[in-house]
Amino acid sequence: MEIERRTFLATSAAAAAVATQAGAAGRDALVDVKIDPWNQPPEIAQLWSKVGGFRHQDDESRQDFTRGVMSFIQRDAARPEQQQHLAAFLKSKKINPLDDVEMTDEEAFQLLVQDPAYAARTRLARTNFALHWDNPRRAFHKEADYYLSEMEKTDNAGPGRLELNPDLDIPDSARHEIHAMPGGYVGEPFAGWIYELGHMYGTADLKDRGRAVSYTQAAKGPADGKVRRILDLGCSMGDGTLAFKMRFPNAEVWGVDVAGPLLRYAHYRAVKVGMDVIYSQRNGENTGLPDGYFDIVGSCITFHEIAPDAQKRVMKEIHRILRPGGVYHHVDFMTDGHPDYTPIKTVAGRAGRWVDHRHNVETWSPAYRHSDFPGLMRAVGFDVDFSQPPAGNSVDRPRSFPTVTGIKRA
């Protein structure tokens, strides 16, 4: 369903906040709309309706099946009987399942797959995951002309704009098939359409995008209260970008990513729901954006997808494009250097990390998880603050990702 921008502004809670707080002060007035991520008002929640999606019920049914299989696997693994079985298996190896162990994540996985139940469940999950990606990919390629024409209609349309750079030098680290998505984010023309339906088994709050709203609502603003320009770095298909615009409707909001296909779909969605944001294909190591341009730069679940040798370059670039007093809002897995960090060293915890690394193609995640990320922020000149609330992954995990704030000294 298309929602006209003027309709949204006339009826939504965001519009009420604009009218109340901004009055006639104009675009430069700070308007900060508070939204409950897990109880969004209908007029905002409806903006997250899937603009994309399948055109045919048989494709939808296949996706529902693989989603259901994964739900069964997850529920089965959590059953007390399965937990007791795994504990008995580890005890047969003279290992207390609750104890930390001195072995690598891969060694822990190789130990657990000696248990037939664990091995079968892990194999079924990986095969089902492949089918879950394959279904939308086949569906969109089967009707490629239709979907390409749909995006062509909005490529040059507003509100907002799309900036693609076919000559951009894509880092090798971004060419991996992240999350095991065939073709990856940069090599698959329908990456955005496929990602929306396949990521997190299609259950990543597609109805209300609670994670994106939680991510942006947790952001700390600059001390002087000025928020005119915001950048969502590694924006993917643009959920966080739109959520930043919902929170700060008067701000100029950018979404930047190296993946052109994701940005093309992000812009398509933004046009369809009438959101005025800018999506631009750039490399986070060297964006080409002006010094001190942004008041807030945010990244959500981005840095663990960046190669270790590139992380410092990206962090230096974030520091450069923030104005003095500007804020970097970081949401990702907890690492060393965080005051609440406790490394998981049980056999099951280590094996789970290995499965995520290999079966979910999280190529750079192990290195990120073992890094001192707050230390990296300090190394480029940020003052680091841990006081902001965590961001959630879903209504069932409302505080699952820590927030780390970097403040550029004035």
Question: Where do the PLM segments sit?
Answer:
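N-terminal export signals
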Residues: 2, 7-27
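N-terminal auxiliary segments of SAM/dcSAM-dependent transferases
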Residues: 96-185
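Class I SAM-dependent methyltransferase Rossmann-like catalytic core
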Residues: 180-185, 189-210
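Conserved alpha-helix/loop element of class I SAM-dependent methyltransferases that forms part
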Residues: 205-226
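Class I SAM-dependent methyltransferase SAM/SAH-binding core
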Residues: 231, 237, 241-286
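A short acidic, Gly/Pro-enriched loop at the edge of an enzyme's catalytic core
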Residues: 285-297
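A short glycine-rich, Lys/Arg-flanked "PGG" loop and its adjoining helix->strand segment in the class I
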Residues: 312-324
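C-terminal alpha-helical "lid/dimerization" subdomain adjacent to the S-adenosyl-L-methionine
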Residues: 329-395
